UniProtKB/Swiss-Prot annotation:
This is Ankyrin repeat domain-containing protein 13C. It is found in: Endoplasmic reticulum membrane. It comes from the Eukaryota. GO terms for cellular component: endoplasmic reticulum membrane; perinuclear region of cytoplasm. GO terms for biological process: protein retention in ER lumen; regulation of anoikis. Residues 37-52 have a biased composition (Gly residues). It holds the Pfam family ANKRD13_C. Residues 21-30 have a biased composition (Acidic residues). It comes from Mus musculus (Mouse).
Amino acid sequence: MTGEKIRSLRRDHKPSKEDGDVLEPCEEEATAALGGAFTGGRSGPGGSGKGGKACHKIFSHHHRLQLKAPAVPGPGVPAPPQHNAVTATCPAPACLGGSNPALVADGGGCPSLYPVHECVFKGDVRRLSSLIRTHNIGQKDNHGNTPLHLAVMLGNKECAHLLLAHNAPVKVKNAQGWSPLAEAISYGDRQMITALLRKLKQQSRESVGEKRPRLLKALKELGDFYLELHWDFQSWVPLLSRILPSDACKIYKQGINIRLDTTLIDFTDMKCQRGDLSFIFNGDAAPSESFVVLDNEQKVYQRIHHEESEMETEEEVDILMSSDIYSATLSTKSISFTRAQTGWLFREDKTERVGNFLADFYLVNGLVLESRKRREHLSEEDILRNKAIMESLSKGGSLAEQSFEPVRRQSLTPPPQNTITWEEYISAENGKAPHLGRELVCKESKKTFKATVAMSQEFPLGIESLLNVLEVIAPFKHFNKLREFVQMKLPPGFPVKLDIPVFPTITATVTFQEFRCDEFDGSIFAIPEDYKEDPSRFPDL
């Protein structure tokens, strides 16, 4: 392993699970979950050893593979169908291979609805190359799989590469919450994992570029302001409670420029890394120069770029192939809000001031963190090594102490040839699809998340405006979690104080303490003249 930096990836759908997105950390084994959670800068103020960064990456890369909360439809609004615009019709139950009411209800098991899926399943590359021009290759079948999912799970590499060449979505997840990249890791073909990883990064860059004009327009229409919020992290794991940080963040917004000042660089080596950090977004600059992070203590800066070297990609593939496949989803399917009560004898709705704003407090009910962990692609040696690392961390050790050097991983022996027919697969009951690919070794867990949220009608900023600001500073992962949580259907008002699950064993209380309309000196959005560029100061940004 070279001294090249390794950066973590980022990553939807309910897991029955590379966002969402879904992220992903969620494991009742506290230390394992936290390993996935702690991402960020170097292991020390001046840098880090390559072994520490590599080991750290094991537990952070799953962010590309999801924690995205599914959108909560309004009352009486059905969830949108996943079928694509194929003109074929399904005449009668005969087409469904029976009278399964679940299939009849959504047309799910009708083979004629999924011609692209069928030719991928059967490995018919010639027909696929014809259909691909006129059909939606991102369509999900009744099991939530896209054609790319099937191509990867069945090892149909020619079909997979053809789909990728036509920009088939990589981040999308099936009904079990797994992305094509996750399935590729399970199958174990290194070339396919690399191709999917590169396409995922390309699509992420394109998505950012597509959103940029809308985001700049929204920022321009939003007034200038100063916003201060406080983060307080907690955990139900005793050892972690002592090391979790708190942070006061200051956000300055002027025109289409944003500056975020924070003292929390990130979680690293099972310890919080503190510093004096500023994140600057300059909407007037070229996209490649819009994002800058300043280390105000060392007086250096780094531009946030999205390109990675060939070596970095290969190293990341090594780590993907030697780590658990992780999925976590924040399920809001049964979420509800009830007014919090106060008083001993005479109960009344709780209303208090949060900072300068009067707020109504609500209890958040039915919020469930669902997680899955797969390791069918790992050898016994891999599992023992990863377990030893986590045990060391749980006893207070650091990643830097682990002399971890991931070796170049070779492709695994393919799983046994698929014996399931297309008709058997597509007519299977929803949620009970026959398994394709390597035999699963999967552990599942669910954790009910208890939270409160304080909503204020007095706060000057609207939720939509907040979402636009948070979208800009999404490279900071805990802010991205805040954005995902706020996207839920909340009670009336603005969430001036709320609890959010940052990771399976870690929650954060976020408090919006101050807001004021203001104007600032333009110099605060510029790189100071005495700062020097350090392209590798923040390897995970």
